[in-house]
């Protein structure tokens, strides 16, 4: 509750959280908040300018850009949420087991992580695309295969730190069950760390799925996706540059929102890292080490 209170006191964090909630709402309620079919082709109305009928105009096939922009939230953001959730779940389970029990279990899980982290995520993604073809599903699978190992390593380090604390040692001494110790004494302490690395990972995952779609290796046409929309706009960027603005700005805004949220979470958990707090302390004549 203290962390949440600090987070809500940060105006930047509140704005970032509001933007993320708005994006998620628009993505889930896309059929309810739009008036057009995102894939409806109207060549007689292509490259239409901004108007009351089309607030952001139309593309080279006469499709409403705003409608496609909203529908693109689903593969660009909501699919990434699913991949992130599965990656964090797998990484957390293995990270807790590795960091708490250590020994043979730790060595076995860490060697598996070494194998997975030996291959760059882009290489794994390209390999899956070569084997199974293009599609968001293969990119999401690649995210899960590469990200779980990274989450596992980070969470393992955090768990090992808390496992060595006095209250956990005391719980072991009195014979408390291992699973109960993890659930009651370690898991609540690591949730904040998991939230920070999850929010920061969202940025790179959104950029990656948009990047692959921009290269024509991600979401298949005619499905609306920000990277795909940028790819389509690239072909007419000199004659109709406005087509690139909407998906580009949408990506920039959501990535900045997750970056701000990640920074705010770190400050909420440990206020000492805030330069503003340090400046106030110096002004008061208090030197913090």
Swiss-Prot record:
One of its GO terms (biological process) is iron ion transport. Disruption phenotype: Deletion of the cntABCDF genes decreases StP intracellular levels and decreases the import of iron, zinc, nickel and cobalt. It comes from the Bacteria. It comes from Staphylococcus aureus (strain Mu50 / ATCC 700699). The complex is composed of two ATP-binding proteins (CntD and CntF), two transmembrane proteins (CntB and CntC) and a solute-binding protein (CntA). Induction: Up-regulated in metal-poor media. Residues 73-262 form the ABC transmembrane type-1 domain. It is found in: Cell membrane. The chain crosses the membrane at residues 13-33, 77-97, 115-135, 194-214, 249-269. The keyword Transmembrane helix applies. PANTHER family: D,D-DIPEPTIDE TRANSPORT SYSTEM PERMEASE PROTEIN DDPC-RELATED (PTHR43386:SF1), OLIGOPEPTIDE TRANSPORT SYSTEM PERMEASE PROTEIN APPC (PTHR43386). GO terms for cellular component: plasma membrane. Keywords: Cell membrane, Cobalt, Cobalt transport, Copper, Copper transport, Ion transport, Iron, Iron transport, Membrane, Nickel, Nickel transport, Transmembrane, Transmembrane helix, Transport, Zinc, Zinc transport. Its main location: membrane. Belongs to the binding-protein-dependent transport system permease family. SUPFAM superfamilies: MetI-like. Part of the ABC transporter complex CntABCDF (Opp1) involved in the uptake of metal in complex with the metallophore staphylopine (StP). May be involved in the import of a large array of divalent metals ions such as nickel, cobalt, zinc, copper and iron. Probably responsible for the translocation of the substrate across the membrane. It is a multi-pass membrane protein. The keyword Zinc applies. This is Metal-staphylopine import system permease protein CntC.
């Amino acid at each position: 509750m203290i962390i949440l209170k600090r987070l809500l006191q940060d105006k930047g964090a509140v704005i970032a959280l509001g933007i993320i909630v708005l994006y998620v709402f628009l993505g889930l309620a896309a059929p309810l908040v739009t008036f057009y079919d995102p894939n409806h082709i109207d060549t007689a109305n292509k490259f239409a300018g901004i108007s009351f009928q089309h607030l952001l105009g139309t593309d080279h096939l006469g499709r409403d850009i705003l409608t496609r922009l909203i529908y693109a939230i689903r593969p660009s953001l909501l699919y990434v949420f699913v991949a992130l959730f599965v990656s964090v779940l797998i990484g957390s389970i293995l990270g807790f087991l590795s960091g708490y029990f250590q020994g043979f279990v730790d060595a076995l899980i860490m060697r598996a992580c070494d194998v997975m982290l030996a291959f760059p995520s882009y290489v794994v993604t390209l390999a899956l695309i070569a084997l199974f073809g293009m599609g968001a599903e293969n990119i999401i699978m690649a995210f899960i295969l590469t990200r779980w190992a990274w989450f596992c390593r980070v969470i393992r380090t955090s768990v090992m730190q808390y496992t060595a604390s006095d209250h956990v040692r005391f719980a072991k001494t009195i014979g408390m069950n291992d699973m109960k110790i993890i659930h009651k004494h370690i898991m609540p302490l690591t949730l904040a760390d998991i939230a920070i690395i999850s929010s920061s990972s969202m940025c790179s995952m959104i950029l990656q799925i948009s990047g692959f779609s921009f290269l024509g290796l991600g979401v298949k046409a005619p499905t609306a996706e920000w990277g795909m929309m940028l790819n389509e706009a690239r072909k007419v960027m000199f004659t109709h540059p406005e087509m690139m603005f909407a998906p580009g700005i949408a990506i920039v805004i959501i990535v900045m929102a997750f970056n701000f949220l990640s920074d705010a979470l770190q400050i909420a958990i440990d206020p000492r890292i805030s330069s503003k707090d340090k400046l106030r302390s110096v002004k008061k004549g208090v030197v913090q080490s």
